């Protein structure tokens, strides 16, 4: 238990020093990781863990929604709002119906978002590679 608390403290501190661009990258990576786990537990019939990881993924999309800047982001922010809301809807449907295909859709969207984010912000993200 002590190691788990130390890890959580490390994670909390590491997010305090990351740039907003790196944090968004980490959120997209978290979506991919949690969706994969939700799908695995869905296929295994472990309802409790499936729900846990779907909820974690939904929480990330909610956080991404909360950080959108409509003044600076304009049409892109509006588009992302609809996209994120649709992913939350798909996750909810996947949770209720145990439909792994809906999780696959969310995974594919998140992969595209992560790839685009990395491409647009390549220069700043390179600072975190070393």
Protein language model regions, located:
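N-terminal intrinsically disordered, cationic/polar leader segments
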Residues: 1-37, 41-44, 48-55, 62, ...
